[in-house]
């Protein structure tokens, strides 16, 4: 069982090849997709102004209001069903959210610290974004025994507030891979791997990943920090690779990109 995650940007640019790659691989797959760009597009069409916030660490992320959560749910459902319809003729597949069967439980972020337009720290309401707290491993194993491909949208359930929450797709992929102690966790991105001085870093140990995370930009630094933590918690290998090539999953499994182990 491998876990594969692609962001919305990769899906916009290379959806057909990603789908074919899922079909062609011999591995059972848990496939987590993003779709942030698509959410922004639909929100704008509906007259809902997308809102983004910047953390003190310099990470820019979506701020999910109640209105935009509804858009997020619509877009994620559309993406997952589109992929399901293409894959199902070839592989036994199912499309889920993390909320289905309480597969992924999360806690709503009550307050978050952001940097405002004047560069000052502010504390604001957390909106409808969540932090993953628990994976129902027993249910996940049951699904993986029944289906070759599990397509998962990054939505989780908050049992305390009885609501769906937008969760970070990378965080969901890492949580799932860690729960299953997966052999491979593949992050398909719009770059070839971890870049240093315009060159791909081919291999990183856990310690090297932690050290490098201090020197590269926000976004990728979070990926390699989470990768290091996943390896320490039982995942055998994390591969950060391009999702824009002919056969992205095969390409990653062949070691193209950055391998952390």
UniProtKB/Swiss-Prot annotation:
Report the sequence similarity comment from the record. Belongs to the acetylglutamate kinase family. LysZ subfamily.
Naming one, the record's GO cellular component terms include:
cytoplasm
Name the major location. Answer: cytoplasm
The record's listing under CDD domains reads: AAK_NAGK-UC
Q: Which residues are recorded as binding substrate? A: 35-36, 62, 166
Q: Name one GO molecular function term.
A: acetylglutamate kinase activity
> Which controlled-vocabulary keywords does the entry list?
Amino-acid biosynthesis, Arginine biosynthesis, ATP-binding, Cytoplasm, Kinase, Lysine biosynthesis, Nucleotide-binding, Transferase
Name the site position(s) for Transition state stabilizer. Answer: 5, 223
Where does it reside? Cytoplasm
State the name under which the record lists this protein. Answer: [LysW]-aminoadipate/[LysW]-glutamate kinase
Return the PANTHER family for the record: N-ACETYLGLUTAMATE SYNTHASE, N-ACETYLGLUTAMATE SYNTHASE, MITOCHONDRIAL
Outline what the protein does: Involved in both the arginine and lysine biosynthetic pathways. Phosphorylates the LysW-bound precursors glutamate (for arginine biosynthesis), respectively alpha-aminoadipate (for lysine biosynthesis).
Q: Which Pfam families did the record assign?
A: AA_kinase (PF00696)
Organism equals Sulfolobus acidocaldarius (strain ATCC 33909 / DSM 639 / JCM 8929 / NBRC 15157 / NCIMB 11770)
Please list the reactions this protein catalyses: [amino-group carrier protein]-C-terminal-N-(1,4-dicarboxybutan-1-yl)-L-glutamine + ATP = [amino-group carrier protein]-C-terminal-N-(1-carboxy-5-phosphooxy-5-oxopentan-1-yl)-L-glutamine + ADP; [amino-group carrier protein]-C-terminal-gamma-(L-glutamyl)-L-glutamate + ATP = [amino-group carrier protein]-C-terminal-gamma-(5-phospho-L-glutamyl)-L-glutamate + ADP
Pathway assigned in UniProt: Amino-acid biosynthesis; L-lysine biosynthesis via AAA pathway; L-lysine from L-alpha-aminoadipate (Thermus route): step 2/5; Amino-acid biosynthesis; L-arginine biosynthesis
**Keyword Amino-acid biosynthesis attributed:** yes
Record-listed E.C. numbers: 2.7.2.17, 2.7.2.19
| Alphabetized InterPro entries for the sequence | AceGlu_kinase-like_sf, AcgluKinase_fam, Asp/Glu/Uridylate_kinase, LysZ
Report which superkingdom the organism of origin falls in. Answer: Archaea
Gene Ontology biological process terms from the UniProt entry: arginine biosynthetic process via ornithine; L-arginine biosynthetic process; lysine biosynthetic process via aminoadipic acid
